[in-house]
């Protein structure tokens, strides 16, 4: 399975993109100091 949801990486500010296997949705693991669905919000 190709993880098309992460190419290109939708996460902002160098967040780490991964695919939720149960839903097929992308999720972002944000670097420290950022929050939001795609790490778009500085803390």
Swiss-Prot record:
All residue ranges annotated as the EGF-like domain in the record: 2-40
S-S bonds: 6-28, 11-30, 17-39
UniProt keywords, alphabetically: Disulfide bond, Secreted, Toxin
Keyword Cell division: no
Molecular function in Gene Ontology: toxin activity
Tissue expression summary: Expressed by the venom duct.
Gene Ontology CC terms, in alphabetical order: extracellular region
Database matches in Pfam families: EGF
InterPro entries per UniProt: EGF-like_dom (IPR000742)
Compartments, record wording: Secreted
Domain of life: Eukaryota
Domain statement: The cysteine framework is IX (C-C-C-C-C-C).
Protein name, UniProt field: Augerpeptide hhe9.2
Organism of this sequence: Hastula hectica
